A protein has these predicted regions:
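Conserved catalytic core of the tyrosine transesterase superfamily
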Residues: 30, 86, 92, 124-129
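Acetyl-CoA-dependent GNAT
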Residues: 2-63, 69-74, 78-82, 129-131
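Conserved catalytic-core motifs of GNAT/GCN5-like acyltransferases
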Residues: 90, 103, 108-125
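Short glycine/proline-centered loop/turn elements that form peptide/ligand docking sites
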Residues: 72, 94-98, 115-120
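Residue-level recognition of the GNAT/N-acetyltransferase active site
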Residues: 61-63, 90-94
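Conserved GNAT acetyl-CoA-binding A-motif
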Residues: 79-90, 113
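Conserved hydrophobic/aromatic "anchor" residues
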Residues: 12, 21, 43, 101, ...
């Protein structure tokens, strides 16, 4: 959990503590997946609710290695397996890398929450349909 906690403290992260990660992993309505090749390379955390999966966090140690795509695909498969029709998420308007990643994954912008984050930036709301 220590490696995951460190990843959760990167810029734009929700700053999950070790205990929060452990608690979330124990929930029956959560999907918590870790990319691990002897060392943690990334993780994805989502919650399932009424046919939807809400992405809570997706983090990778290094960009451009395919770990994020692998985790996203695994999340989609796990969410489908739990009967979800879509993955919903929010991303900071300032986090262009994440926005690009989600758009490449075919997530669509469906709304905006003004001044959602502590720094006053808006949250961009996106949906990813699960066929």
């Amino acid at each position: 959990m220590g490696e995951i906690e460190a990843l959760a403290r990167r810029p734009f992260a929700a700053a999950w503590s070790r205990q929060a990660c452990a608690d979330e992993a124990e929930r029956t309505d959560s999907i918590f997946l870790v990319a691990d090749d002897g060392a943690v390379r990334g993780y994805v955390l989502a919650r399932v609710f009424e046919g939807e999966s809400q992405l809570l966090d997706l983090a990778v140690v290094e960009d451009g290695r395919g770990v994020g795509r692998t985790l996203w695909s695994a999340l989609a498969q796990a969410a489908r397996g739990r009967g979800c029709r879509k993955i919903t998420l929010e991303v900071s308007e300032k986090n262009s890398r994440a926005q690009h990643f989600y758009r490449r994954a075919v997530a669509k912008v469906v709304g905006r929450r003004p001044k959602f984050y502590n720094d006053g930036s808006d949250a961009i709301l996106m949906d990813f349909p699960l066929a």
